[in-house]
């Protein structure tokens, strides 16, 4: 995926050994990782997080120090037309991965293990005319996508509280940058402008988003998993409202 491929390249460049699990839906593209595909520290497995047995097998075999969970259906408009896919991947898939992580953690002597759930500020709903979302902002999802991500956030925290799974959650604003799928807003605007086609306007055209460069986001993800406190939530934004 978009954020995941940028994160994998960063982690491999810093000497980490990576197992990359991806279902390779329409939004996945292995060409994003051609620069590291032959790296001995990198391994790719084509698998679906909705396959509970496969997740348990892969986690047990790889014996990770950290699990960084970025697998998700993420297009808001598609979630309106086909919400079932979002429920399955974002909620059931997260449940499966949490159970695989719990099984591994409880049978392992690895005291450095952590499950890092990467989420979105969409779970907070609309911000209003000013201010910022904070880690204390109440959840107010407005679409099947954001509702499914909110559900997955709560599942992760519940596994931390109920089973003692070492977890951390990060919620990010809108990412942009290399390898982003063409359906997203900035690639769509660029593509339409280059082709001389009308640029789509959403709502009354007054909506404002915070934009976060994907490589900056990846640095923030790395910071959270390296120094974040167990059980905490961290918002990652760009302070770049447009």
Language model features: what each stretch is:
Residues 54, 180, 211:
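Short acidic, gly/pro-rich beta-turn/loop elements at beta-sheet edges
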Residues 122-124, 207, 241-242:
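Active-site/binding-pocket entry motifs
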Residues 169, 211, 241-242:
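Short aromatic/basic micro-patch
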